């Protein structure tokens, strides 16, 4: 058992050695004070060849920047706008992994974790710390790392669920920098239609998984007349909070963690962070738990609602890339697709606008060259756009093509139909769905 001591950020990062692999707590809880201290060591020529691993991070990301080429090398599990350009320029990299398995990388030793840098709440009466808004795979990193540096921040909410024992920590650093908050754009008319179409698939008493952003917020707004919904998700934000406050989400029909909101990380307003602070109705859990398909499936009528960058006419779903350009990450999409479809009465839903902001169709004859298939065609079920919803489960390739074309943008349907005919031959036009 370790006996943590309080030190300054500059003193703490002296534990980092050249060649180390470093885990950063992510999303709203990035330990920027430690990153800044590490940059000072790098600027003085004290360390090099450091590898960073993390989920989506908010704020400056010097660990991915060209000026630290050869000194820092970023290998994130999920990309945000702060690292995306550097990854696609080759100054940083992307490590594909289902989020539910990200913790296994550390626990199995498949990925080194020499140093874990995390943010934690003030300790409770038993000396235990909460990882607050970012439990994800940070708990696994803390358990696996040779050295653990924890920033104790009074702005990190104390969330019930999986906690960190002080016996796992080497160094504690006090810093009360506010957590990053994020306001998402209001849904546009297209997103509102998609949200409405998704909401029509959600029965009262269902259990939800959804992400963050304008489209999930549109769905949340369309669910205000539903009753007795549950929440078991990897993350949530303000749209979900509104449903909880209105009593729409109460978890009364959940078969596991009944009455509890279960998540692994958050990003949103300060109100969301305050909501989880010492709230016994919220459990912030290890990603191993939240994203375990078997755990997910224990809740009946589980609704996994995710998005895509494009879908081809056979139902292959790309969500992490646009052609060869990495956009985000695999995320937990497949974890929840599998869990929802294993659930009694569950549904997997992939929702997106029929066209990009530039007017290009997202339902395509074939995926752009180099695009990653996140959800394979055999796992594709409900597909939703502003023009409707179709279920691909149990449908042949030609049947899928007809269904998908029916919810494509009207101006793209003729071209898609022609492409389907060229692919499948004359029989394609000889049957109806």
Locate each region found by the language model.
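Conserved alpha/beta enzyme-core scaffold
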Residues: 1-433
């Amino acid at each position: 058992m370790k006996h943590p001591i309080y030190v300054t950020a500059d003193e703490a990062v002296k534990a980092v050695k050249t060649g180390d692999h470093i885990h950063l707590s992510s999303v709203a809880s990035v330990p920027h004070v430690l990153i800044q201290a590490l940059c000072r060591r790098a600027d003085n020529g004290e360390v090099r060849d450091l590898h960073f691993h993390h989920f989506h991070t908010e704020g400056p990301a010097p660990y991915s920047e060209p000026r630290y080429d050869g000194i820092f090398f970023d290998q994130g599990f999920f990309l945000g706008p702060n690292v995306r350009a550097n990854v696609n320029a080759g100054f940083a990299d992307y490590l594909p992994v289902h989020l539910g398995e990200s913790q296994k990388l550390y626990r199995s030793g498949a990925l080194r974790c020499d140093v874990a840098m995390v943010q934690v709440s003030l300790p409770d009466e038993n000396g235990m710390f909460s990882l607050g808004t970012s439990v994800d795979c940070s708990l696994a990193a803390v358990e696996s790392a040779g050295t653990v540096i924890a920033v104790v921040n009074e702005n990190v909410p104390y969330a019930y669920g999986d906690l960190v024992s002080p016996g796992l920590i080497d160094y504690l650093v006090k810093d009360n920098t506010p957590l990053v908050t994020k306001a998402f754009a209001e849904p546009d008319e297209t997103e509102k239609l998609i949200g409405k179409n998704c909401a029509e698939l959600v029965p009262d008493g269902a259990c939800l998984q959804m992400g963050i952003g304008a489209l999930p917020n549109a769905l949340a707004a369309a669910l205000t007349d539903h009753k007795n919904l549950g929440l078991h998700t990897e993350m949530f934000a303000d749209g979900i909070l509104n449903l909880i406050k209105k009593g729409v989400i109460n978890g009364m029909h959940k078969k596991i963690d009944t009455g509890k909101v279960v998540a692994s990380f958050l990003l949103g307003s300060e109100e969301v962070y305050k909501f989880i602070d010492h709230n016994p109705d919220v459990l912030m859990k290890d990603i191993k738990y939240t994203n375990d398909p078997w755990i997910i499936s224990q809740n009946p009528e589980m609704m996994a609602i995710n998005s895509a960058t494009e879908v081809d006419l056979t139902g292959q779903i790309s969500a992490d890339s646009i052609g060869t350009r990495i956009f985000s990450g695999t995320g937990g999409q497949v974890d929840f697709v599998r869990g929802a479809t294993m659930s009694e009465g569950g549904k997997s839903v992939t929702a997106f606008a029929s066209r990009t902001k530039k007017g290009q169709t997202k339902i395509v004859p074939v995926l752009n060259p180099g695009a990653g298939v996140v959800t394979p065609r055999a796992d594709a079920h409900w597909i939703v756009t502003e023009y409707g919803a179709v279920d691909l489960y149990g449908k042949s390739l030609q049947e899928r093509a007809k269904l998908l074309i029916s919810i494509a943008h009207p101006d793209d349907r003729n071209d898609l139909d022609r492409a389907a005919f060229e692919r499948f031959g004359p029989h394609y036009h000889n049957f109806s769905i």
